[in-house]
Amino acid sequence: MKAYDFTQGNVLKQLVLFSMPIMLGNALQVSFQFIDSLWIGNLLGAKALGAAAVSSTIVLTVLSFILGLNNATLTILSQQKGKDDIKGMASYINAFVVLLTGLSIGFGAAGFFLSELLLRLLKTPESMIPLAETYLQIQFIGILFLFGYNFISTVLRALGDSKTPLRFIAFAVVLNTVLAPLFISVFRMGIAGAAYSTILSQGIAFLYGLFYVIKHKLVPFSIPRMPKWEESALILKLGIPAGLQMMVITGGMMAIMSVVNSYGDHVVSGFGAVQRLDSIITLPAMAAGTAVNSMAGQNIGIGNEKRVGTIARLGVIAVISCMLVIAVMIWVFGKYLIRLFISEPDAVAFGEQYLKWIAFFYPFIGVNFVLNGIVRAAGAMLQVLVLNLISFWVLRYPFTALFSAWLGQKGIGLGIGMSFLFSSCAAFLYYRYGRWKAMKLFTEK
């Protein structure tokens, strides 16, 4: 597969061609979770689905920290790729492998033995705990596969290859789609079968990916050895704030749910439906953010500030154009999209109302993803953490509470939409006037 050298060539063409496989990969990740829920809900019932959902929340919280380390991977390796420092790339990849293996063992063991305690801390209904504990313990047994599966994709994207990871993700989705009903119903393993199907699919995809990249020499892997202290320190320096960003987002959404929950079942159901749509609507923006991170990282690595500016400018134009088209589609077809998930009239009415309020604010969240991706490429992870704190806790939650208190349930969409607008303004101000351009991850020898 082709790996892009983002330090030369047509920026817009590279942005589109590189981000499309990332968007498809993210869509497949969403479908992985959707298909899993579909089989569990239909074959095992609502209680099993609830148990799996609670367990998945815990696993995703742990994964969010690891995704932070993956963002550090993307930034560090993109800059090394830009400098064409193969030895440096190999050394940092080794450090990531050692850290991820250690964290996998630590998180896996702790999660396995603390599963019941974690579920009780989340106030899981007593009737669900046995099912949830079974599902969660199996997930923690296979957490190395989950980490590794995401890690290989991130490394390849950092090196300019977004197509090869799509192969592994698609393989895992197809495998899970086949294995889940087989393990649940044919082998009569129940919810344990669903969990084993997930980790087996991810495990085989991880091993397939590892074999593929080694065979085709796509990544400079080596026999693992103890990394240098400065390498581990840099990874953690960037990775911990990036991991906390994900937790800030999760916590912010939980706070917003407290506002939504106060309006009754029909609003909660309608909001749940629009959140499912939201995970699809924002796929292009997320893909653009990941793409510009890799593209800008390579150019920051060689000090090409002018091209970084071009990437930012064209990235913003492209994402606004794309999200405006999506906004029009949401405005016109929102009611029908909501009905894919729910049929209760009051819930559908709220969902349609929400989408009409928020539709034309979506381009601003695209701007946010792109500009944060640019500054993240320079290693400004702590600064992006602060921007996310502003976005979710200074803007989104207060605006949602304020506008809903003023306008009732229709104020929820307006409040969240206004937070998109002001968050993008904050991101632009830091991009324009912040000191991220002066950051240096590596000292010249």
UniProtKB/Swiss-Prot annotation:
Main location class: membrane
Compartments reported by the entry: Cell membrane
Alphabetical keyword list: Antiport, Cell membrane, Ion transport, Membrane, Transmembrane, Transmembrane helix, Transport
Transmembrane region(s): 15-35, 49-69, 95-115, 136-156, 168-188, 194-214, 240-260, 277-297, 314-334, 355-375, 384-404, 411-431
Record GO terms (molecular function): antiporter activity; xenobiotic transmembrane transporter activity
Membrane topology: Multi-pass membrane protein
CC terms in the record's Gene Ontology section: plasma membrane
CDD domains reported for this sequence: MATE_yoeA_like
GO biological process: monoatomic ion transport
UniProt record similarity statement: Belongs to the multi antimicrobial extrusion (MATE) (TC 2.A.66.1) family.
Protein name in UniProt: Probable multidrug resistance protein YpnP
Name of the encoding gene: ypnP
